[in-house]
């Protein structure tokens, strides 16, 4: 809502490749999801395809009549989540629920933490690695310097920016 995409396009136009990318995909925006919804949905997305992710999230929302909070899911166990058919991800969801609700993950302070500290905080959850943490930080905590990298992004970076991203993206790498 408060992102000045015009200013970002101006900054990115300093780099020829990024300027072309902005012209090609100028309508893409970063969602501002609820932080728990972002964390749990990116846990569900691990090593998964979009139709299956949609199915798991659909079953979760149907069961709870909407997207549940961590508090709503407080009594869930690996066995009780069997209806999701999420496989190994169920144990990661349960661990996330437990760590968020117990305060072991300082969920309320993540937004104020520096990026590396926030990433490390989320990575205390079983199954949360750098990509899931960065996706959660970008979409759920609006940390625009978080830059989720899957295999495809890594390949593009290796091809186009082998020496690192240009300075015009500093602080907004995730956008």
Task: Give residue ranges: language-model regions.
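HhH-family (HhH-GPD) DNA N-glycosylase catalytic core used in base-excision repair
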Residues: 1-175
